[in-house]
Design a protein with these regions (language model features):
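Bacterial N-terminal signal peptides that target proteins for export
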Residues: 1-10
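C-terminal motif of bacterial Sec signal peptides marking the signal peptidase cleavage site
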Residues: 17-20
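Mature extracytoplasmic or organellar-lumen-exposed domains after removal of signal/transit peptides
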Residues: 26-397
Length: 397
């Protein structure tokens, strides 16, 4: 028994010695203990047992815009006046009483530029008609023309390809510019400048009706609640850009914005208006950053630059998406409530890229940051406005 006790004692001393050798003086030892995780707030709100959240309007407004893009603009399918009439009818009247034409740049902040923005859309319809062969004796034959420097046409190997695109004489795929106008001038404008306009949540009448639970006719929510929910609904269309993988600068953006929406809505329910304003500011700042990062990344990402270096035809869609993303930046907001960029400024960026031979000018586009009209130059200029650098938007692999 004594012998066994001696053996156990020796083993204990040996283990203690080994344990002490595995730690160095001053070393931080990671504990197995983890602080309990606080669950993310949920964007689910009810009144008398039924949901008080409704953003159906968002999809009803989006559907005709998606239809215009996919059925007519992307495929240059406005070969006859009847098709042009349908496109304009969808844009002017939409469906279910929601008219895209009336909702574009509808915020008071962009009222002064609204006419010019609508003219840009009209020009896209006109250019698409031309690319489609509208007014030509044989529209189908005219449409079957490959784009090249100074001449609009299809971009791809064959006219029958699935992923076909159509560019104007500058190499700009106008369908992608249309999307940029929609993402910025409707969705982003609705989020930041209409439904999250801080003046709404300071309005005495709206606050009083909200606190008295004065619901909108036939609905289960107050006017203030509905404004916040519609902002959240339109944000769903920006969510894929927020979730863009591999960009460290946006790594926390999704959860930050989601939490801000959920916490802001809860604060609104509890009449904590200071908290509502704090969350509103967070959404404004973070989503504006997302828009800027997206524009910069589309211009100078490895995908864009790689395709441009290999075959410019493969890069035109990405470059045009970048132009559309630049256009959308006029709808982003500073903390002060003023736009980061004006209509004229974003147009100047696009004009710089499309000057001369436009997006066909591979040498200029691939120039360094100091080269006017290069992708890096324009992206860097945008970055300065938002406090971002080209290094900030590099992917981590």
């Amino acid at each position: 028994m004594k012998k066994n006790t001696t053996i156990y004692s020796l083993l204990f001393l040996l283990l203690s010695a080994l344990s002490s050798c595995s730690q160095w003086e001053g070393e931080t030892v990671e504990s197995a203990y983890r602080e309990p995780q606080i669950p993310d707030p949920s964007y689910q709100f009810k009144r008398t047992g039924s949901s008080s959240v409704d953003y159906l309007e968002c999809s009803l407004l989006r559907d005709p815009l998606d239809y215009i893009y996919s059925s007519y603009l992307r495929t240059a399918n406005i070969m006859y006046e009847s098709a042009m009439t349908r496109v304009k009818d969808y844009f002017d009247h939409g469906e279910f009483g929601l008219k895209p034409q009336e909702e574009l740049a509808a915020s008071p902040l962009h009222k002064a530029d609204r006419k010019r923005i609508l003219n840009d859309v009209e020009e896209i319809f006109k250019v698409t008609g031309k690319l489609s062969g509208l007014g030509q004796p044989s529209p189908g034959t005219y449409r079957n023309h490959k784009a090249k420097i100074g001449e609009g046409g299809y971009v791809g190997i064959h006219i029958g390809d699935v992923n076909i695109a159509f560019a104007d004489e500058k190499g700009l795929v106008v369908a992608e510019l249309f999307n940029g106008i929609v993402w910025g001038g409707i969705y982003l404008d609705k989020i930041l400048n209409v439904h999250l306009n801080d003046s709404l949540y300071n309005d005495t009448r709206l606050r009083r009706e909200h606190e008295n639970t004065s619901l909108l006719p036939g609905r289960n929510y107050t006017e203030l609640e509905h404004h916040w929910d519609l902002a959240y609904g339109y944000y769903q269309y920006w969510l894929p850009f927020v979730q863009a993988g591999g960009l460290p600068v946006l790594r926390e953006s999704r959860i930050k914005i989601y939490n801000a929406f959920a916490r802001g809505r809860l604060a609104l329910t509890e009449y904590r208006y200071d908290e509502v304003q704090q969350q509103l500011q967070l959404i404004r700042t973070e989503l504006s950053k997302v828009a800027a990062v997206r524009a910069m990344n589309l211009l100078v990402s490895d995908i864009t630059l790689g395709n441009l270096d290999e075959d410019i035809n493969n890069a035109l869609v990405f470059l045009s998406q970048g132009c559309g993303a630049l256009y959308a930046l006029q709808f982003t907001l500073q903390e002060s409530g003023k736009p980061h960029l004006s209509y004229n400024q974003v147009k100047s960026y696009i004009n710089e890229l499309t000057a001369g031979n436009g997006l066909w000018d591979k040498k200029r586009l691939l120039g360094d940051e100091a080269t006017p009209g290069s992708l890096k130059h324009v992206a860097a200029q945008v970055g300065k406005v938002y406090g971002l650098t080209l290094n900030d938007i590099k992917r981590s692999y």
